[in-house]
Amino acid sequence: MLREVSVTRELNVWLVKQVDKLQAPLCQVFVEPFSKPWVLLADPIEAYDIMTRRPDFDRSNFITDGLSPMDNFHARMKTGPQWRTTRAWLQDLMSPTFLNNVVGPVMFDNSMNLIRFWETKTKLANGSAFDVNDDLDHSALDGMLSFVFDRHFEHTALGPQIETISRIAPTSLAVGPRGEVRFPRAPVHEFISALYETVDKIDVVTKAMSPKLAMWFIRQTPSYKRVTAVKRQVVKEQMQGALQRLEATDEPRTAIEHMLVREKKAAEKQDRKADFGNHIMMDEIAGQFIAGLHTTSTTLAWTFIYLTRLQHIQSKLRDALHQACSDAHAEKRVPTLAELTASRVPYLEAVLEETLRLHATSVARQAKRDTEVLGHRIPKGTNVVMIANGPGFHAPAFDVESARRSATAVKSKGWRETSDMRVFDPDRWLVHKAGAAVAEVEFDANAVPQIAFGMGPRSCWGRRMAYLELRLVVCLVVWNFDLLDVSPELADPKASYGIVHRADQCYLRLRGRRTL
């Protein structure tokens, strides 16, 4: 394993090879030294059952250890009182009111900022491709900054890049060996840099043979201590500003303000003094940026990679968007936020879901007590890793006898399976709308299994927010640009598995559509 994964950086690929080798929906592999073996589960029905209905499973220590650079962030906690406390702080942030009135407008403005930046880059590149991975990271982080912190936090990730690009001449751009244009990178504020460094450390810990040992070494380094101090200092300053605004208006607006109000209400209910300065809340606030960074930017990168490779799907998506926002298309303008969110576009949903399906990372749960999976004994403390890129997800499922399933899993029905489950095909998510007078399709979220966000009570907390950002960015990019073909060596980047399945590069060759 070490030899292969050190070269490919694709642990999930190695795991699914073990499943294919044994041709069994349940097998065990030894991954971490001096630890129990992992149990690999390659069956979406049983995986769904474990995540949603089985109380004998909880957050895996693979995740709690892997996310340890985030310190007290809720995603690395076992289910218990402290996890419930932190989740209660976040209760308002996924409400329709907050998403529609706060997140939506700032995400739209942020996406348009990215569009304008790419228009400048497109002119400078003069028909050549350029890597947008960093741009997508910066844009995702700026989106979070704009509603977690107050607008008075003037620092952004994309801003310095825009300023730097505005001052360069096309003749000064470096050109890579494959004809790609290389734009210079500008330094960012120390808080933003600290967030990126935390993400890098998560990647190191997750991929280490012994995550706990790797994290112990990281904690001893001056750089980690500096990063932690910077994050907590900036968050503390923002919390103090939020408290002052709440005293003046008593009306929460930003994410921090909503969290502080929730802590105040909880303290009143429990007859205690509100603890606004605790490190758990500080780490939770900083963790919001990190959790929403690579997850959305990585999905966007893969989406644009597929749309570049598959021009017919790109055209079909653009046609669907033009039809959904027909007034904006007829008036040759960019649709407004209200127009983009007025109705769901089935084909857009299908494109996003297909990207998530093909690049989901495996989900792990840990047995809280001795239990069984598919008739096999699972001892307490065992990590069960649900393979997201194997049989049942990227290939036809194994035939499992009902007698081997749990009582709740027996009642579950399977999904539509085809021989091309490794192929990017959004149409697999569309079904004919029942009772429609004309041939009309609708998006079926349950058409095919995918577990990119996990499922059940420990699924991704920010799922709704992520979908909102994905829809807005993809809509606006496809509306404003043609994603032209790039050379084969740029169209098929290498990738690595960590917390996310991240492409090393995302090369785009853009042509503006504003005048088309």
Model-inferred region functions:
Residues 4-20, 334-374:
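Conserved cytochrome P450 K-helix E-x-x-R motif and the immediately C-terminal K′/meander segment
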Residues 309-361, 379-382, 419:
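Cytochrome P450 I-helix active-site segment
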